[in-house]
Amino acid sequence: MSGTNSYLAADLNDKRLTNRFNIIVPQLEKGLSHTIPQTSSNKGEMEGVYRFFRNSKVAPDSLISAHVSQLDFTDNSNSLPRFLCLSDSSELDYTGKRLASQLGPLSYLNQRGMILHNSMIIRDDGSPLGLLRQDYIIRKDEDFGKSREREPLPFEQKESVKWLNHFKAAQHLCTQHPMQMVYVADREADIMQVYHARRHKNMHFVIRSQHNRKLHNHPFKLRDLLAKQTIVGTYEARVTHPKTCLLYTSDAADE
């Protein structure tokens, strides 16, 4: 299924906007790595795209939901198909841009932008399937540098709740389709709320450890136990690009 077809099922509850969207998607798909002006054949076409996305009735969640509902989770094999949900955050830096004053701090107070948190679904052979969820986070100036002061806040009010929300979104797919889902995230997702949220037997996770946690009914902590394990094998991950090639080798017991 092409990206265009998966988005054309979107229903914006407005016939005019839905028709406009059906025109815009093929236009943008022709140049996924290009800007809107670059994908537009004239100024009127460009302004039409900008007007569409500025419309308050156009909600990102409705577009992504329509996309997810059209994804093909079937598999030709007789076994239960396995999918990976890759979840991570990126900083969108708009420092020096016209709208920078309306955004929040990033690594330092004068660096202005927003946090983009994506969860991408891929097949276990590495082929991309689609975008599961996307969140934008604009930090407040008054909260900058006060992470310790925010510790007593309810978890739902913390930025790290994004990991839990995306984990739950991935787990929900297990209730809708016959599949195995593996949630993959970096050490920021090493949060007890995420682990406690696992409910479905086909929902799994691979999360890089950040905390040397205590283990249930075991005298050692996590890292102490791993240090005592015998390496049983290694794996290679080859990431290729037309201009670069990266080969990463890791001991199996390290992960």
Kindly give the residue locations of the regions a language model identified:
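A short acidic-Thr-Gly-centered motif at the start of a beta-strand
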Residues: I64-S79, H166-P178, H196-A197
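Short, conserved catalytic/metal-binding motifs centered on acidic residues
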Residues: L84-S90, V182-A189, F205
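A short alpha/beta connector and helix-capping loop motif
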Residues: S101-Q102, Y195-S209
